[in-house]
Amino acid sequence: MQKISIFLILIFCGTAAGAQLFQPVHYPKTEFRNPLGIPISLSANFGELRSNHYHMGLDIRTRQRVNLPVYAAADGYIYKIKVEPFGFGQAIYIRHNNGYITLYAHLNAFQPALAAYVKKRQYELERWDVFLDVPAGLFPVRRGDLIAYSGNMGGSMGPHLHFEIREFPEDVNLNPMLFGLPIPDNKPPVVRKLAVYDRDRSLYEQSPEFYPVIAAGKHYELAQRTIYTL
């Protein structure tokens, strides 16, 4: 009986500790605004697999145009600026009062005061490609302030704004869709077929069994109501 009691206590303590360790993170839902002045429409989402990396932000369409105004998503100050021929092209990093960083990339131009500062630093450093640490307080921004104009610079395949939210100081990328941005989600997924795998075998040792499905109102069901023996 004593052993059983000790065992139950250990289970309870382990469960309680695990619950405290894996508490859900609640991200602010109202502090960040749409960085553009048009409704958000995505051409690429967070976490998509690319040839050699994961896509760590949102690609927001700019109606196949450049030079749309880009706005600060929240209060803070510009603390880094990047200019490079590939990658982000021209980019702005804003550190916010709430402990996050936002990144705006593939910009066509900076707002005039910022552009003058970048040009001055480029001449001082005698190089075009720069990654500048901007002194804190030199370029404070308020939510909605104009900071740049959208573009197609760097490693971009078409006009858009690449937008990221990161955690400071770890510089960890977070999914911007966790922060309550007004992103329409009105296209339900289309299910074409059901694939069944044998869990006792490796995925590399088998091909799935496919079963046709049909739409039935707001859900899908098997096209043939048959009992399958797997």
Name what the model sees in each region.
Residues 158-165:
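Histidine-centered catalytic micro-motifs
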Residues 115-133:
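Intrinsically disordered, low-complexity Ser/Thr- and acidic-rich flexible linkers and loops
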Residues 4-13:
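Sec-dependent N-terminal signal peptides
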Residues 18-91, 95-101, 110, 128-130, ...:
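Surface-exposed, glycine-biased beta-strand/turn segments
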Residues 104:
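A cross-family detector of function-defining hotspots
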Residues 96, 165-167:
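Residue-level signal for short segments within beta-strands and strand-turn junctions
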